[in-house]
Swiss-Prot record:
It comes from Campylobacter curvus (strain 525.92). Methylated by PrmC. Methylation increases the termination efficiency of RF1. This is Peptide chain release factor 1. PANTHER family: LD18447P. The modification N5-methylglutamine is found at residue 231. InterPro entries: PCRF, Pep_chain_release_fac_I, Pep_chain_release_fac_I_sf, Prokaryotic/Mito_RF, RF-1. The gene is prfA. One of its GO terms (cellular component) is cytoplasm.
Length: 355
């Protein structure tokens, strides 16, 4: 019975409450801190579980009144409401019981790179960049450009952002993959629709303690910074390129005002990429028997199509199609794509966990 799975959480919460009132514990700051953190982590489950158990009682009480001449009709209405509430609470609790992604609350590096399609791909990188920063702004996140390479006709060949805010990774982690765009270029006189593609990578910002890099595995090159079109923008060798020799990963940064700043920014991106690579390998092992693009954040496959003539956006992982592309690209309705992706992932995780 589902209720039986909840009682250990209620018992543990009450046990911790009693321990936190114990004078011996109060004088032990380390134990107090550990118990307080555990209690905080259990509290949402405890609150939902208490409501769930109360709802079960309400259901039984109303069932007992169904044949009552005076209260039967009211009991029938109350029973229906309680049964709906029971289902809602069950789903809420199942989500709370899922193992938390340790990266969910982290800041992210968001990398958008032009793929096939030349100038059109670079222009769409710019469009996606604008959509993401509008969404970040609406969510109250802060962002900064870590590095950028402008396209010859506008937009960007590549741009990397650091988006800061609690839950940034949890909201945007399913954006990684190939995004295909279909639209008529401004230079197209025949009105033909062109198809181009960009790739997006979402990488959690990592602490130094989370990933170790052997300095001997790095090759660091410094060079003259260059601006749009390749012209020199200063007289010092401030641009930095870092190569991680074992993996072949290369990160270049020249947007900072000093070599030190550029090296620091490049190292942060390199660590995020290496961490993402390690996480992808770990997840691939854990989910080898269950192929789920949403669950694994697979970057290799086409995840979404943006069709401008039809004002249509389609996410191929969950068979979702919306005809509000203009509003979604404006950032305000981005959650209409993100929320179903999160719900799909949670539903799969609940099934896998046997809840």
């Amino acid at each position: 019975m589902f209720a039986d799975k909840l009682r250990p959480f209620l018992d543990r919460y009450n046990e911790i409450s009693a321990l936190l009132g114990d004078p011996n514990i109060i004088n032990d700051i380390e134990k107090m801190t550990k118990l307080s953190k555990e209690q905080s982590s259990i509290e949402p489950i405890k609150n939902a579980a208490s409501q769930y158990l109360q709802t079960l009682d309400d259901i039984e009480e109303n069932k007992a009144l169904l044949d009552d001449a005076e209260l039967g009709e009211l009991a029938r209405e109350e029973l229906k409401s309680a049964q709906i509430r029971k289902e809602e609470l069950e789903n809420e609790i199942k989500i709370l019981l899922l193992p938390k992604d340790p990266n969910d609350d982290k800041n992210i590096f968001l990398e958008i790179r032009a793929g096939t399609g030349g100038d059109e791909a670079a222009l769409f990188v710019g469009d996606l960049f604008n959509a993401y920063i509008r969404y970040a702004d609406l969510r109250g996140y802060k962002f900064e450009i870590v590095s950028q390479s402008e396209g010859s006709a506008g937009g960007f060949k590549e741009i990397i952002l650091l988006i800061k805010g609690k839950g940034a990774y949890s909201r945007l982690k399913f954006e990684g993959g190939t995004h295909r765009v279909q639209r008529v270029p401004e230079t197209e006189s025949q009105g033909r629709v062109h198809t181009s593609a960009v790739t997006v990578a979402i990488m959690p910002e990592v602490e130094d303690s989370e990933i170790e890099i052997n300095p001997n595995d790095l090759r660091i090159d410094v060079m003259r910074s260059s601006g749009h079109g390749g012209q020199s923008v200063n007289t010092t060798d401030s641009a930095v390129r870092i190569t991680h020799i074992p993996t072949g990963l290369v990160v270049t940064n020249q947007d900072g005002k000093s070599q030190h700043k550029n090296k620091e920014a490049a190292m942060k991106v390199l660590k995020a990429r290496l961490y993402e690579m390690q996480e992808a390998e770990r997840i691939a092992k854990e989910t080898s028997e269950r192929k789920s693009q949403v669950g694994t954040g697979d970057r290799s496959g086409r995840i979404r199509t943006y069709n401008f003539p039809q004002n249509r956006i389609s996410d191929h992982r969950i068979n979702l199609t919306l005809y509000r592309l203009d509003a979604i690209m404006a950032g305000g309705l981005f959650d209409e794509i993100i929320e179903p992706l999160i719900a799909h992932h949670q539903a799969e995780a609940i099934t896998d966990a046997g809840l």
